[in-house]
Amino acid sequence: MALVQPQPSFFYIPMTPDSSSASPDAAPQRVLLLDDDRFMLAMLRDMLEDFGPFDVHAELDARSALAELPRHAPHLLICDLAMPDMDGIEFLQAAAVQGFRGRVILVSALEDGVRNAATELARAIGLQVAGAFRKPVAAEQLRRAVQC
């Protein structure tokens, strides 16, 4: 019988700035991705890579992301709403309590009403919501939200 090795709850995604779109002295914008789906994290990473210089850190669960917030100090948080253990709304509330004041992009396969309610809640607790999108997110939607 083979033993199953536990999988880490996070992985770091180094980003190489696209020299054609970034000024040479521009520091990469720090982004924290939070989604319990590895495929979605990879898809978001690939899109961000096309948009410019980003220092991306990805987390598969909200509790690990909360621990990473002060260390990574992201400018932008891209967050799923439907996750096990701690959902995106609980995560956003905890992030606000920790003092996170960066921009937020919400992504979810949940219905529009849930995304709209989450957007209003995030704004009510002082977060800057740059967008709320249905999964899978279109690249152009994400580009506009990231650039605002």
Report residues per predicted region.
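Two-component/phosphorelay signaling modules centered on CheY-like receiver
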Residues: 38-57
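Non-catalytic signal-transmission and effector/linker regions of two-component phosphorelay proteins
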Residues: 1-32, 42-45, 98, 128, ...
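Active-site residues of response regulator receiver
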Residues: 35, 80
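A Lys-centered signature of the CheY-like receiver
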Residues: 135
